[in-house]
Amino acid sequence: MDGSVAKGTSCIQDSQSSSVIANTDATLGRHLARRLVEIGIQDVFSVPGDFNLTLLDHLIAEPRLKNIGCCNELNAGYAADGYARARGVGACVVTFTVGGLSVLNAIAGAYSENLPVICIVGGPNTNDYGTNRILHHTIGLPDFSQELRCFQTVTCYQAVVNNLDDAHEQIDRAISTALKESKPVYISISCNLPAIPHPTFSRDPIPFSLSPRLSNKRGLEAAVDAAVTFLSKAVKPVMIGGPKLRVAKACDAFVELADSSGYAMAVMLQPKGLVAEQHPHFIGTYWGAVGTSYCAEIVESADAYLFAGPIFNDYSSVGYSLLIKKEKSIIVQPDRVVIGNGPAFGCVLMKDFLSELAKKIKKNETAYENYRRIFVPEGTPLKSEPNEPLRVNVLFQHIQKMLSDETAVIAETGDSWFNCQKLKLPEGCGYVTNNSLSAWYPFYLQTLEEKSSCCRYEFQMQYGSIGWSVGATLGYAQSVPKKRVISCIGDGSFQVTAQDVSTMIRCEQKNIIFLINNGGYTIEVEIHDGPYNVIKNWNYTGLVDAIHNGEGNCWTMKVRTEEELTEAIATATGEKKDCLCFIEVIVHKDDTSKELLEWGSRVCSANGRPPNPQ
């Protein structure tokens, strides 16, 4: 046997090589730890509580697994989200109900973004199930299922482990389901079980075997033939990548089609960074009236458009204002293709469809040539006068210069969406597809290291939970320690989750955080203004200095002018390059991107539609 593995089969090692585990290590807690390590998790984000303390003891006993204690459960969940974006899977550990319901919001966000996050909860003692006892950390009822029922709508699998006999099976099924579905799962483990040995944990676990999903061959052929016929009739077809390129692992196939077709290629906002922006036919971000200049004009004037993995919600469609006609569209979802108003082809995987279409499509560069004819390069911000108050567009001009293959960008919900979408990601950018979870794990970390040498861009648009970026920055940076994470966070969002800057310092992270202080919830102001959008101003650098408290490496600076910003960036990337750098950028409360002004008015109109007549 040559040791080769069929393409797409997940396997960690030959199961015949499994060794006997000492009885003291053959516990439920240690088994769970080994399983997490096996799929690529090296860090778990946790908040201790009396129901999960023994479990945490056994997780940290695994030398390959590090516990990252967070300030609250919400941030622990956001950190697992950020970790999963870089590594392909993440995990958090919280306590029963008070911890579970606190982390629930973050798990819902991970579900919306198709991220496999394993949410582990320390549950009640096995002897309390089925009794009439009332426990603390509950709502005062003897029914312990409230937490489980809450998680059922935001996870793809739920396991309640209160019996050792089936614990092995339940844990394995939950983890494998998270990887197969690319969604979060919930695992509750009774607090009196983690330390108990059991025969099912006495050997190294048999490796996960995730059989590859296959396209229906006849359906694939029919879908490709129908698409070729549809596109061959078009004079100026275009192609647009959507956020589900990530979960479909179809980024390479999408670029392959762009190479062979010659079509003008754009991406929607959510998948920015999933494909290289240096591609010769890349025309920018398609986001209707607020996307890259001239991109919407080319896309919406096309007579055929292929969307790969789109999500058309009210935010991505700018208040449902995109000028897209269904009869001109090919919509390719992870396992389904719909051409115009029909036909539809199920059981056809996106990556297979795009790859096969690339082999048969005729080259047509008309749309891209049209783009080249009308394109006018964007101007640069007005030059600042000496000591003039800093403008946001000047800030992002400087952030642009900081980007390299050694950086990643995290954009908070708000005006940072609009400013960061205008950043030009440097050569080598592209999503690190976690195909290694479909291959041999021993090569996983090597593959991750090789492919992570690119500038990445992450944000949460579908769920849009303000404060997400603090925890996500913590998790992302922990997963890829060789990168310097640049986070752009508004003051309102920062006030929601600020505490875990403390955890970044404790973990010796070297992130650069730009705190944009404009005195309120700017994105809400542009949708619907009111006194509730004004927040209490904090001394943000003073707060971070207090959190730092002289322990660890942290440097802060408050900037009000371009000269001060230039000095701060030079220090952060030079003398303080090994520190967590927190730069508070003070700008005018009305200083927003023009795109936010347009987007806000359209979303406001969509939100304000009167009820349909009954």
Curated annotation (Swiss-Prot):
Keywords: Decarboxylase, Lyase, Magnesium, Metal-binding, Thiamine pyrophosphate. This is Pyruvate decarboxylase 2. The gene is PDC2. Pfam families: TPP_enzyme_C, TPP_enzyme_M, TPP_enzyme_N. GO terms for cellular component: cytosol. Signal peptide: none annotated. The keyword Ion transport does not apply. It is an enzyme of class 4 (lyase). It catalyses: a 2-oxocarboxylate + H(+) = an aldehyde + CO2. Substrate binds at residues 50, 137, 524.
